[in-house]
């Protein structure tokens, strides 16, 4: 079975090459991201393997189907970059890696919280320049504070477990609340308005759907507690970035930790240090000393990268052997908020 992999980074190739002989697949790697202009690279392939910044829209899928591609294998959990309705029309199953490492992303979210709260990033640069002043570096005790978690899927539940260890109170919101989980974890499901009003830290862990796109905008920010720390390790378009910038300028948002950005394609996963940044919104965001942006690296641990490769290859093997596709995703009228 021939597989064309798009958006390949060196670590992808290493992890897939370690196990490719076990599965016996022929893999062709490309650094470029899949889109309608380079889809011809998949000519002669049985499957394409894509990541978060590849584009499998209706036009691209139509071309893939015309080439005889039979499977789209995502090596990530999210699937908002795939037109599932188009895939269904052309009879191309879509599989994903639903839980490669919820620990990795949850731990990264906590790292962002701690760094922003205790100003670790600012202290690092100060001491390197010989400035050992504590002025402007005061944080707050996490103990006794309230965390608001939007979405209570695998990653969020791991995060909640960690935050409870700090002695934090946790309130959550999910389209489909789980009362049994809430009782076991010692959390409370509350309406979003109440979550925004109570939380000292708000962390987003929901997929991108029509319901959640730009859920954090001017209206939501206006209802948040002054000085709130906002964390997003989910999807970039959950936050309207210009509204976030306004909230930061008005000091309504105390700090923001972002592992995703709504227009991250073309920047994230690439070294752009030798060229002028033409995204004025991202440039403005990076100018704040109370904002930390990481390049969608929340998943990036040895364990997670290995799990991604193994699960992706097993998904493809199941398809090639006509087995039930346990990790298939299909078009639905509305996807649940708590999937991540």
Give names to the regions the model predicted.
Residues 1-95, 217:
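An N-terminal-biased, well-structured beta-alpha scaffold segment characteristic
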Residues 40-41, 194-195, 220, 284-285:
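Structural alpha-helical scaffold elements that stabilize or flank donor/cofactor-binding regions
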Residues 52-53, 200, 206-208, 234-235, ...:
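Short glycine-/small-residue-rich Rossmann-like dinucleotide-binding loops
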Residues 66-71, 90-92, 168, 226-228, ...:
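A short helix->loop->beta-strand "cap" motif at the edges of active sites that frequently abuts
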Residues 90-92, 98-146, 158-161, 165:
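Phosphate-binding beta-alpha-beta segment of Rossmann-like dinucleotide-binding domains, i.e.
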Residues 135-226:
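Rossmann-like dinucleotide/phosphate-binding beta-alpha-beta segment
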Residues 227, 236-340:
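Rossmann-like dinucleotide-binding domain for NAD(H)/NADP(H)
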């Amino acid at each position: 079975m021939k597989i064309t992999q798009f958006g390949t980074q060196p670590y992808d190739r290493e992890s897939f090459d370690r196990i490719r002989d076990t599965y016996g697949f022929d893999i062709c790697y490309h650094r470029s991201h899949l889109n309608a202009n380079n889809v011809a690279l998949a000519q002669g392939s049985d499957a394409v393997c894509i990541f978060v910044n590849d584009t499998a829209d209706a036009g691209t899928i139509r071309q893939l189907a015309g080439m005889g591609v039979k499977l789209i294998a995502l090596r990530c959990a999210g699937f908002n970059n795939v037109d599932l309705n188009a895939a269904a029309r052309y009879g191309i199953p879509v599989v994903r890696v639903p839980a490669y490492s919820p620990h990795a992303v949850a731990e990264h979210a906590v790292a962002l919280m701690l760094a922003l709260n205790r100003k670790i990033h600012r202290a690092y640069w100060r001491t390197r320049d010989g400035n050992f002043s504590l002025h402007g570096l005061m944080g707050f005790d996490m103990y006794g504070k309230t965390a608001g978690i939007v979405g209570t899927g695998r990653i969020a539940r791991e995060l909640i477990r960690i935050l409870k260890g700090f002695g934090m109170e946790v309130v959550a919101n999910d389209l489909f609340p789980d009362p049994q989980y809430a009782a076991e974890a010692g959390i409370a499901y509350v309406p979003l308005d109440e979550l925004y009003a109570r939380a000292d830290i708000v962390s987003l862990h929901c997929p991108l759907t029509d319901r959640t796109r730009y859920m954090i905008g001017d209206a939501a920010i206006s209802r948040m507690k002054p000085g709130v720390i906002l964390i997003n390790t989910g999807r970039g378009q959950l936050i309207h970035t210009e509204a976030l910038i306004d909230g930061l300028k008005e000091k309504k948002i105390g700090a923001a930790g972002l592992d995703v950005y709504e227009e991250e394609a073309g920047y994230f996963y690439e070294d752009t240090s030798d060229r002028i940044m033409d995204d004025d919104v991202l440039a403005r965001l990076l100018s704040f000393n109370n904002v930390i942006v990481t390049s969608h690296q929340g998943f990036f641990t040895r364990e997670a990268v290995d799990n991604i490769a193994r699960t992706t290859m097993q998904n493809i093997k199941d398809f090639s052997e006509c087995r039930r596709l346990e990790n298939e995703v299909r078009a639905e009228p509305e996807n649940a908020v708590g999937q991540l």
